[in-house]
Design a protein with these regions (language model features):
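Cys/His-rich microdomains that often coordinate metals
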Residues: 22-27, 47
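Flanking scaffold residues of small Cys/His-coordinated metal-binding clusters
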Residues: 13-18, 35
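Short alpha-helix plus adjacent loop in nuclease-associated cores
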Residues: 172-189
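Short cysteine-rich clusters marking metal-coordination/redox-active sites
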Residues: 18-20, 40-43
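Acidic two-metal-ion nuclease catalytic site recognized across multiple nuclease folds
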Residues: 198, 219-248
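Short linker/helix segments within small regulatory modules
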Residues: 29-38
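Conserved non-catalytic scaffold segment of RNase H-like nuclease domains
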Residues: 51-169, 189-209
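Short Cys/His-rich micro-motifs in 6-15 aa windows
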Residues: 44-51
Length: 248
């Protein structure tokens, strides 16, 4: 190899540690491995190859309820979150707020979420709530179910719509954890209800599609799936994406 070829080859190679806490073998592989399931040649531990192997053990599991499906048009009307650190839920450290949107909540959304205009009357605007949430969450990695396609987009859209100064935040979509555990689900998908059923989790005392009820289920699901997969407290091996939160 000439010098240029050698440099290009090195740029295509990445090094990570095996996410198995009992192994931690240094592994090398091409960047084309990212997103693929591989096995450590030393211990045999299977994981998703990713360039987001971190040492942080601090996470925030959250859920949004919104006026609709479109981040560019709709707003969130409720947010709930709980801290998840070192493999454990910190049930005493939670965040919750309604948010008052600029459009009326439709009867369909009220029937779906249980949240109507009377619940958000007098609540702060979504951008105010998001600033408070950002301050509370700190540098934690965010976890949401279907977060990459939905929740993360609403966070970023809220920041952009109101011209807020922003910071990038690492995120995990818990659907990826479900896929790592359950693989091909033969068309039944990885909805939160299906995940709850597969894990045999008890029903929540809170309403489904209320952010508090969904976070209660998702928090227990993340704990259960992580334990079954043998993931380390940093959830190494689970793909990450990024969103934006207000810089406060």
């Amino acid at each position: 190899l000439n010098r240029i070829q050698f440099v290009l080859l090195r740029l295509c190679i990445m090094k990570i540690s095996c996410p198995n806490p009992d192994c931690k073998q240094q592994l090398s592989g091409p960047k084309s491995y990212i997103g693929k399931q591989v096995a450590c040649p030393i211990c045999g531990f299977e994981f998703i190859w990713t360039d987001f192997f971190r040492s942080t053990c601090s996470f925030v599991i959250y859920d949004l309820e919104t006026t609709g499906l479109y981040p560019d048009e709709d707003e969130f009307i409720q947010i709930a979150a709980v801290r998840y650190e070192n493999g454990c839920l910190a049930a005493e450290d939670m965040f919750f707020s309604f948010a008052r949107p600029r459009r009326s909540i439709s009867s369909f959304i009220e029937s779906y979420t249980g949240i109507g205009n009377r619940h958000v009357a007098g609540a702060p605007r979504p951008e105010e709530v998001l600033c408070r949430f950002s301050q509370w969450a700190g540098e934690a990695t965010l976890i949401a179910h279907n977060g990459k396609r939905f929740d993360s987009k609403f966070l970023a859209a809220t920041c952009q719509r109101h011209g807020l100064p922003t910071r990038q935040v690492d995120c995990i979509d818990s659907i990826h954890i479900s896929k790592m555990l359950f693989g091909n689900t033969r068309g039944t998908g990885h909805s939160l209800d299906h995940v709850k059923s597969r894990l045999g989790l008890r029903e929540t005392n809170l309403r489904r599609h209320d952010a508090r009820g969904d976070v209660d289920i998702l928090g227990r699901a993340v704990v259960s799936m992580s334990q079954r997969l043998g993931l380390d407290p940093s959830l190494n091996g689970v793909p990450r994406h990024q969103t934006m939160l207000p810089r406060v």
